[in-house]
Swiss-Prot record:
SMART domains: PUA. Keywords: Cell cycle, Cytoplasm, Growth regulation, Transcription, Transcription regulation. It is found in: Cytoplasm. NCBIfam families: unchar_dom_2 (TIGR00451). The lineage of its organism: Eukaryota, Metazoa, Chordata, Craniata, Vertebrata. One of its GO terms (cellular component) is cytoplasm. CDD domains: MCT1_N, PUA_MCTS-1-like. The PUA RNA-binding domain is critical for cap binding, but not sufficient for translation enhancer function. This is Malignant T-cell-amplified sequence 1. GO terms for molecular function: RNA binding. It comes from Danio rerio (Zebrafish). Plays a role as translation enhancer and involved in cell cycle regulation. PROSITE patterns: PUA. It comes from the Eukaryota.
Length: 181
């Protein structure tokens, strides 16, 4: 999604949100990420301005004080940015890939089933279409945010094809964006 993303070329406009819209977004975030409940007021303080940065390809990035927090495509689900995920790693369920998959994931490739079932990888129970953080064997922080394309049970049974779609990874265009004022 952000492989060829460039802030100067892809950002079309930025709008400040009304309080009623912010409440709706917070409720949507709570529904989507129940683990965020205790931390949402710390992530999105009440008095701080919340803005939506609109980009090409119908991508919207939610910012507070210029810090990029969540993004979504069209009116789809929100995904946390990796910077937010590194501060609050418990927001998303984790899946772990083996060392051999790291360079491919960091170049934007989707996570294949064998990379999740081999020694060194850890596959935790999760349903299809669940937003997950991708951890790497021997690494502390998440290297990618992805969406399960199959349930964990199906990944173990089939062990072929794409298991998790890579949505946002370290060093992609969104990672390099840092802040937006």
């Amino acid at each position: 999604m952000f492989k060829k993303f460039d802030e100067k070329e892809n950002v079309s406009n930025c709008i400040q949100l009304k309080t009623s819209v912010i409440k709706g977004i917070k409720n949507q975030l709570l529904d989507q990420f129940p683990n965020i409940d205790d931390w949402l007021n710390q992530i999105m303080p009440k008095k701080d301005p919340v803005k939506i940065v609109r980009c090409h390809e119908h991508i919207e990035i939610l910012t507070v004080n210029g810090e990029l927090l969540f993004f979504r495509q069209r009116e789809g689900p929100f995904y946390p940015t990796l910077r937010l995920l590194h501060k609050y790693p418990f927001i998303l369920p984790h899946q772990q890939v083996d060392k051999g998959a790291i360079k491919f994931v960091l170049s934007g490739a989707n996570i294949m089933c064998p990379g999740l079932t081999s020694p060194g990888a850890k596959l935790y129970p999760a349903e299809s279409d669940t937003v997950v953080a991708i951890m790497a064997e021997g690494k502390q922080h998440a290297l990618c945010v992805g969406v399960m394309k199959m349930s964990a049970d199906d990944i173990e049974k089939v062990n072929m094809g794409i298991g998790i779609e890579n949505v946002h990874y370290l060093n992609d265009g969104l990672w390099h964006m840092k802040t937006y004022k």
